[in-house]
Amino acid sequence: MNLNINTLFASFPSGLAQGLLWGIMALGLYITFRMLNFADMTVDGTFTTGGAVTVMLIIAGWQPWIAVLVAFFAGLLAGLVTGILHTKLGIPAILAGILTQFALWSVNLAIMGFSANKAISVNTYSLAISSRYVPHAILTGFITAALTVAVMYWYFGTEHGSAMRATGNNPEMSKAQGIDINTMKMVGLALSNGLV
């Protein structure tokens, strides 16, 4: 591989397209680590779960955007499991995340038909974002990231979103104000893992 300045500039557009989508994952991590003060290890498993669900649905003939939406809900469920383990069963936050992460390894293999990888090609399947069509990929990534940030900004400005932010900042005071902090933690974990 020739490493020169031209190669660097040639790889910039596809890196930008991928980086925009990775930014959504960073937003999901921000919700648990910064807003809820919850060290969530579940995201290691839900990242793979989202990919496994998306790939298997695209291979089955589903549209990529519908597959991504279903993968979002799969992540929601995984985050909810972590939330239930922590809030309802009293398992410490870090351990609840690790338990869910380990469980997701088996779940991910089952989703993919007990195969460690699945081949997916832009030649065979209609993909929403591909490095082959870089201008389209950058535009799609930018629109997706902008819409996600806008919806999250709106949500965290609502009463429910403010209650979630308050839960992370000061759980004792939030509880004194009548906020169900366990529900807020579960919703935050579900939302975070869905975005990842």
Model segments located where?
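Membrane-interfacial amphipathic/re-entrant helices at transmembrane-helix boundaries
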Residues: M1-M25, V53, A60-I66
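Interfacial loop-to-helix junctions that mark the boundaries of transmembrane helices
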Residues: N6-G15, W65, G90, A128-G141
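Transmembrane alpha-helical segments of multi-pass membrane transport proteins and ion-pumping complexes
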Residues: W22-L27, L76-I84, W105-L109, V149, ...
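Membrane-interface helix caps of multi-pass small-molecule transporters
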Residues: I31, M56, A60, L77-L80, ...
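Short, non-helical or kinked segments that cap or interrupt transmembrane helices
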Residues: T32-G50, L85-L99, A163, V187
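Alpha-helical transmembrane segments within multi-pass membrane transporters and channels
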Residues: W62-F102, I143-A146
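Transmembrane helix-bundle core of multi-pass membrane transporters
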Residues: A93, G97-G157, M186-A190
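Membrane-helix/interface signature in polytopic inner-membrane proteins
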Residues: A150-A190
